[in-house]
Amino acid sequence: LIGYILNQAGGIIRLFKDLKKHFVNNVRYISKKRIIFFSKRYSDFPKYRIPSQFLLNLSAKAPLLYFAWHFGADTTGQIGLATMMLSLPISLIGYTTGKAYYAEIATIGKRMPDKIFKITKNVARKLFLFSIIPFSVILFFGPVIFEIVFGVKWYEAGVFASILSPYLLTQFIYSPISEGILSVFEKQSMVLLIEISRVLMTFFVFFISFLMKWTPNYTLILYSIGLSLHYFFATYLVFWIIKKTK
């Protein structure tokens, strides 16, 4: 917790230093006319991004909240460990790849969609090839790996990780490329629609699970299938946006 706080504090301090530097260098260009123009020009960012971020956080936390309420703390702890371990490559590798990719296509701009399409296809292919082996290992040997690494009592977390691995594989491919494309091509409304569909999919799964009185395993299987399809079609949508702009 202390490390997290220090890390966040360091990031905020650096942000304010950079902000101060840019403000001093560009304050002479600020005018009421420019403020009004850019407020209108980029109004879609706060209008769609803020609710999108809220829905993203809601759908991400929904599984733990549902399992804590319906199945108890022990099962929730097992799922928490499984999702945390599977999310590490998405957080580390996916975030770094996404930032580098975003910087490259932002430099190119949306006026060269053919070049962006080629780059995006190459990045998605490399992400898939890079992730297919580790996620396949978790899919087939997750319970054994978790038992060896964390102990016998975390065997069930390995089972859950095995179930969730297909969905997190599709998320690993989608996340790095989506932010760049949807921002560069100014499709902020699409971001909101994608997050709405994820929330609806998530709550539909848990609603069915509750009505049918499913076990945690069956619930996670449907959840993993649902979100795998969600990210598959969301990735297709990203490529469709580029093609449509050609």
Q: Model-found features: residue ranges?
A:
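Interhelical loop/hinge segments that connect adjacent transmembrane helices in multipass membrane
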Residues: G3-Y4, A9-A60, E104, K110-K118, ...
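Interfacial transmembrane-helix starts/ends
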Residues: S43, P113-L129, S136-F140, G158-A161
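Membrane-interface junctions at transmembrane-helix termini in multi-pass inner-membrane proteins
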Residues: P166-I196, W240
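Hydrophobic alpha-helical transmembrane segments
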Residues: L1-F23, I196-M201, T215-W240
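Interfacial segments at transmembrane-helix termini and the short loops linking adjacent helices
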Residues: D114, F140-T170
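Helix-loop interface residues and adjacent transmembrane-helix termini in multi-pass membrane transporters
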Residues: H70-A73, V184-F185, K213
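Helix-loop junctions and terminal segments of transmembrane helices
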Residues: A82, L86-R111, S178-V184
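Alpha-helical transmembrane segments of polytopic membrane transporters and translocases
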Residues: K47-Y48, P63-L64, G77-G94, K126, ...
